[in-house]
Amino acid sequence: MEQVIKMDEELSRKIKFLESIPAISTVTATIVIAETAGFSLFTNAKQLTSFCGYDIVLKESGTYKGQSRMSKKGNKHIRAALYMPALTAVRVNPTLKPFYNRLKPKKAKPMITVVAVQRKLLCLMYSLWKNECNYDAEFEQKKVARVKALVTQDRVKNEFETS
């Protein structure tokens, strides 16, 4: 498997982007890329999550509204490949650890939060593959800081205009 990756320079370069995510190994990246045909079949992350079976379905009939659950109609190989990386990510990934800890008290079953982390990992892999960039652990913090700066700037501007 590693020899095939080394033979294709572009594939090797793009897999390095995915491996920059803590908890994603060469094997996991290769399985996801092989099962999704290099993400070439998808135009957005929502299509990808649906393909993998991470989409949510509702059971409804008339006035009855059942619980929502994961469809599992998608690719079981990707879900199986992302299970262990998700468990590792909640321990070592600086972005996914707070995400997991925030969801954990809200959910009755711990597996629900692990599946949410799996979905987030998959979307992150898709984004890095499409944008051809390495994982940046501070990306979320930088984004929040930019939004806070804009909000503060707007408040100051509004106070100045009303004065």
In which residue ranges do the predicted regions lie?
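A detector of single, family-specific signature residues
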Residues: 1-163
